[in-house]
Amino acid sequence: MRQAEIKRKTQETDIELAVNLDQQEPVAIETGVGFFDHMLTLFARHSRISLTVKAEGDLWVDSHHTVEDVGIVLGLALRQALGDKAGINRYGTSFVPMDETLGMASLDLSGRSYLVFEADFDNPKLGNFDTELVEEFFQALAFNLQMNLHLKILHGKNSHHKAESLFKATGRALREAITINPEIHGVNSTKGLL
């Protein structure tokens, strides 16, 4: 079973997170940051994974530590659940439209961490969520999953639509990458490991 559960406690956050790559339920997100909960729920639905997150953070400061640390723990959990990555497609790409916005995510579960992020947000806040944290989350996710991740807004105006498009596109690209392909024997690399 491709699943993992991680508990991580620091002086800034206390996080319990569980993933199952081969089940779609349950999805239950509680971070104390409403917009972020919404984005993580969309990410889970579009990647078709089970994801539960219970996070308590120093929200009296702001939501930066909570969002970044959830990205760290989610990346670690996904990496653990993938194991040796035998049989997976490894690569995934998705374009997701949302009204006037078109977002793209392309990723490689290569074991090499890198983020390319091309998105601007006109609105600095969505609820109590700072839009600059979209990049912080994906940076933490990419580096801890050890994934090469390219994100881009091709066009759009509405900040909510832009963020939502990127979370959905990343979820859909991840589903493609983690899917086991019966035509792939071992790992999808000439090196013999990922």
Swiss-Prot record:
This protein's UniProt keywords: Amino-acid biosynthesis, Cytoplasm, Histidine biosynthesis, Lyase
Top-level lineage group: Bacteria
Listed EC numbers: 4.2.1.19
Pathway: Amino-acid biosynthesis; L-histidine biosynthesis; L-histidine from 5-phospho-alpha-D-ribose 1-diphosphate: step 6/9
Organism, as annotated: Streptococcus gordonii (strain Challis / ATCC 35105 / BCRC 15272 / CH1 / DL1 / V288)
GO biological process: L-histidine biosynthetic process
InterPro entries with a match to the protein in the record: IGPD_sf, ImidazoleglycerolP_deHydtase, ImidazoleglycerP_deHydtase_CS, Ribosomal_Su5_D2-typ_SF
Family matches, as NCBIfam families: PRK00951.1-2, PRK00951.2-1, PRK00951.2-4
Subcellular location, principal: cytoplasm
Record-given protein name: Imidazoleglycerol-phosphate dehydratase
Gene3D superfamilies: Imidazole glycerol phosphate dehydratase, domain 1
Enzyme class: lyase
Pfam family, any one: IGPD
